[in-house]
Amino acid sequence: MADRDRAGQYYQQQRGQVGETVKGILPEKAPSASQALTVATLFPLGGLLLVLSGLALAASVVGLAVATPVFLIFSPVLVPAALLIGLAVAGFLTSGALGLGGLSSLTFLANTARQAFQRTPDYVEQARRRMAEAAAHAGHKTAQAGHAIQGRADQAGTGAGAGGGAGTKTSS
């Protein structure tokens, strides 16, 4: 009965050590909710701004190509020409602003990802070291259990051999 109690205590102790080992392997600091929300917001926003930048640039070029001959042929007055130039400049500035916003958003996202990946090797090395320690500990405990079983087998063998040899046969 005492052996069972010791085995139960041993199991509970080993189970606690394994739990601590697993906790040690997992990263202690995960991305916060605000960081995850930032990434989830900025990535689509950056892509959308880049798409809008491209559309604004394309619309400016097409509008300039279509409106220039119309204004020159039908109304050679300075007001429509100034309007045309103003709209073209506004289109190019809008395109540049949207492109700059998209690029800055994606740059921030790339820097955040780079910083996260630079921290990862520390966690990997720490996990590798803890796994090696756990494997060495398991090997040590296995060797102890093997020695204990060997000792019990030796005791059982010497106890049976000391019984007087009632079942042995001698030849004359």
From Swiss-Prot:
Q: Where is this region: Polar?
A: 2-38
The Gly residues compositionally biased stretches are: 158-172
N-acetylalanine occurs at which residues?
A2
Q: Which domain of life is it from?
A: Eukaryota
Q: Where is this region: Disordered?
A: 147-172
**Is Transmembrane helix tagged as a keyword?**
yes
**Disulphide linkage map:** none
The answer to whether UniProt assigns keyword Ligase to this entry is no
Q: Where in the cell is it found?
A: Lipid droplet; Membrane
Keywords, A to Z, come to: Acetylation, Lipid droplet, Membrane, Repeat, Transmembrane, Transmembrane helix
Q: Which GO terms describe its biological process?
A: lipid storage; response to freezing; seed oilbody biogenesis
Broad class of the protein's primary localization: other
The UniProt entry's GO CC annotations, sorted and at most eight, read:
membrane; monolayer-surrounded lipid storage body
Topologically, how does it sit relative to the membrane?
A: Multi-pass membrane protein
User: Where are the residues of the annotated region Hydrophobic?
Assistant: 39-110
Q: Which residues cross the membrane?
A: 42-62, 70-90, 91-111
- Give the similarity note: Belongs to the oleosin family.
Role this protein plays: May have a structural role to stabilize the lipid body during desiccation of the seed by preventing coalescence of the oil. Probably interacts with both lipid and phospholipid moieties of lipid bodies. May also provide recognition signals for specific lipase anchorage in lipolysis during seedling growth.
* Designated name of the protein: Oleosin 18 kDa
Organism, per UniProt? Oryza sativa subsp. indica (Rice)
